[in-house]
Swiss-Prot record:
It is found in: Plastid, Chloroplast thylakoid membrane. It comes from Pinus thunbergii (Japanese black pine). This is ATP synthase subunit a, chloroplastic. Belongs to the ATPase A chain family. Its main location: plastid.
């Protein structure tokens, strides 16, 4: 009997692992539209964490920074250097807040999926996860980046900005137009795919071996999440710099 039960229990366990689902959503009906409620909830948590941290960090600024203020100034310096490197010495200033906000939102969103126990909170449908685990979030961030670099180019060059589409030769017009469509696609799918894959791998490993084994993968996921935030922010700054200078 035990010999028969063993394969059956193994099959049941495999069936439970196969229950790890993708694309299950908790919908809110707003007007005539359905929105992903769990994405809004987790995004609000991330925004609250960022606003709360910023408020605490700057509530009592000192002339000689110490502790938390010193750490915040180090982060701001990092954003400034990143933006200046990609956009250029003369134009980078106004774009530091945008690039910094992009990096922080993506970074905290990615880490929230690994560090916060979203699974404790049960929803009627779907489950809570990192905001960047949803393709709608990453597409929105990518489209916001596209709007930013079009705005930067038009502000700097006016209608002459569109002359880049026929450079260095008008034959490349279709390819240059296609490039502007592939930029947001690559930004959104790269971020979404990496975060989703990381959470699925951890979920499967926890189902197979609940102790010890998933821990190194979780640490690797934290590292990957930080790298993805850096890649997104760097590319966003590079696209903005390219739209203003025409050479990157």
């Amino acid at each position: 009997m035990d010999i028969v039960r063993s394969p059956i229990s193994t099959l049941n366990h495999i069936y439970e692992i196969s229950g790890v689902e993708v694309g299950q959503h908790f919908y809110w009906q707003i007007g005539g539209f359905q929105v992903h409620g769990q994405v809004l909830l987790t995004s609000w948590v991330v925004i609250a964490v960022l606003l709360g941290s910023a408020t605490i960090a700057v509530r009592d600024p000192q002339t000689i920074p110490t502790g938390g203020q010193n750490f915040v100034e180090y982060i701001l310096e990092f954003f400034r250097d990143l933006t200046r490197t990609q956009i250029g010495e003369e134009e980078y200033g106004p774009w530091v807040p945008f690039i910094g906000t992009m990096f922080l939102f993506i970074f905290v969103s990615n880490w929230s999926g690994a560090l916060l126990p979203w699974g404790i909170l049960k929803l009627p449908q779907g489950e809570l996860a990192a905001p960047t685990n949803d393709i709608n979030t990453t597409v929105a961030l990518a489209l916001l980046t596209s709007v930013a670099y079009f705005y930067a180019g038009l502000t700097k060059k006016g209608l002459g900005y569109f002359g880049k589409y026929i450079q260095p030769t008008p034959i490349l017009l279709p390819i240059n137009i296609l490039e502007d469509f592939t930029k947001p696609l690559s930004l959104s799918f790269r971020l979404f795919g990496n975060i989703l894959a990381d959470e699925l791998v951890v979920a499967v490993l926890v189902s197979l071996v609940p102790l010890i084994v998933p821990i190194p993968v979780m640490f690797l996921g934290l590292f990957t999440s930080g790298i993805q935030a850096l890649i997104f922010a760097t590319l966003a700054a590079a696209y903005i710099g390219e739209s203003m200078e025409g050479h990157h």
